[in-house]
């Protein structure tokens, strides 16, 4: 498919419907490919080889020189006949800065989702934010239902305002054990709350001049000198970066 306009792809599995709304158009995608991938991953038996294929949606962009492409898609699972999403559109897709913003409309509210790579103050619709990630839900009368800011310092929309002293804090690591980072210096009691996120520096990059890859973890618990994360064991690293965040929910 040639994406002259945004496309919506719909699947149905048993009683569950699923929409994939690809918001990119020809300015950032040359073509959309619908393909069946093998349903098996290791052909250890004939029954494995007979596993039904997995349908995939591929967005493709080509150029003779290095390029940057940013994709935006809204994924909507639902069990009703009609999707709860009325419309979705891409408000910003700046390849130079990496800033992206999406507006998703429902019958009774509108969500604004903002992703950036810096702390520049930007405005999309009724939302002004400085941070790497922000989400705001607004009702049909313009009242803010809830707002969330991650790794940022400021978010404002109507009567809702969030301010953080700093977007992130870097902590030096003394050692690691299973799912726990042990810190060189103590932290304040509320600096690493349950459910917050941190980034851990990975191995050296494959090419010089590139940043080290980082892995994100969700915090399960913390003491003054340690942070334990959920689900996965941690790896040796010299430092971790706490991503500060705040969520507010307003009564309507």
Task: Give residue spans per PLM region.
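Non-catalytic terminal regions with compositionally biased, polar/charged low complexity
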Residues: 56-72, 76-252
